[in-house]
């Protein structure tokens, strides 16, 4: 259960969830024979359910694949479920555009911002995605004003290396605003709140 201090910290943030709907999300390599897409639905719904108790006006949501990046504001768990029912994995991974859309949603209030990106593969725009993060970092006034947490779904080693580079080795940033976790690392946390607090403090 979240402590009063944790809840007080997270109440200072708006939250945006970005969901990778690229073709590789259909890969069935999650424990129990599940697809990455099915597993991510379960994980995203849980994340939204937990954080909607803190962010009462609803979460921001970005869904991205191929040339299609969609944004939704003020979503709840039912909207997350609807998004998954209406889509199936296809196309490539336009991460830079997705991050730009997430930052636009996040910047609608004076609160600090937390963006969580569920993704499984290397984006088709690696350098552009890194530039979006770098530019966002350099606009911040404090190191906790913006946090971007990547959670890698699946086991693509190239994707893992890329996300860890964004976390540990991205050059030219005013602040380190990125944290990256594998799904196994994320699941070790007792709660969504603990995971988010750790990413903010990282």
Question: Model regions: which residues?
Answer:
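Acidic, low-complexity intrinsically disordered regions
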Residues: 1-202
